Amino acid sequence: MLQFLNRCSKGRGAWLLMALTALVLELVALYFQHVMLLQPCVMCIYERAALFGILGASLLGAIAPKSPLRYLAIFIWIYSAWKGVQLAWTHTMLQLHPSPFTTCDFFVSFPSWLPLDKWFPAVFVASGDCAVKQWEFLSLEMPQWLVGIFAAYLFIAILVLISQFVKPKRRDLFSR
């Protein structure tokens, strides 16, 4: 399996497939926000930014999958997925155990050199409350789904990183 992941990480197809999954999740989030009129909270926006990190990592990996740039893409992928798990877990705890003493921020605070909420307000401006449960599917809230999604991204990313140190098996069909 690790040899298979090693081969996949050196081709564009797997990276583009990951980009497609992240893009679909981003489009679903925008559908929830602009069509279903669910108001994203600050944690939702941070989770969205982590998903954009995974999307960016996959596009970086697709640019030059056979070069050392692939390692940078894998590390960005792992970092974004890890932050996504942390954010989604914190968001889940805010929803499952609401407290007047533990709340999320009122406004998103991106770095001054990357004010995404100013550049793309339709995507990165928060208007909801983190403790409010707005959507449920199969008895799980949205942040609970995101814990699983980000954990899957993280698990696969760690396997891909480990596979980089496995030598691919040579397929020499005519040497026997």
Curated annotation (Swiss-Prot):
It is a multi-pass membrane protein. GO terms for molecular function: electron transfer activity; protein-disulfide reductase activity. Gene3D superfamilies: DsbB-like. Coiled coil: none annotated. It comes from the Bacteria. It is found in: Cell inner membrane. InterPro entries: DiS_bond_form_DsbB/BdbC, Disulphide_bond_form_DsbB, DsbB, DsbB-like_sf. Keywords: Cell inner membrane, Cell membrane, Chaperone, Disulfide bond, Electron transport, Membrane, Oxidoreductase, Redox-active center, Transmembrane, Transmembrane helix, Transport. Its main location: membrane. Residues 32-49, 90-144 are periplasmic. Pfam families: DsbB (PF02600). The chain crosses the membrane at residues 15-31, 50-65, 72-89, 145-163. Disulfide bonds join 41-44, 104-130. Residues 1-14, 66-71, 164-176 are cytoplasmic. GO terms for cellular component: plasma membrane. One of its GO terms (biological process) is protein folding. Belongs to the DsbB family. Required for disulfide bond formation in some periplasmic proteins. Acts by oxidizing the DsbA protein. This is Disulfide bond formation protein B. It comes from Yersinia enterocolitica serotype O:8 / biotype 1B (strain NCTC 13174 / 8081). The lineage of its organism: Bacteria, Pseudomonadati, Pseudomonadota, Gammaproteobacteria, Enterobacterales.
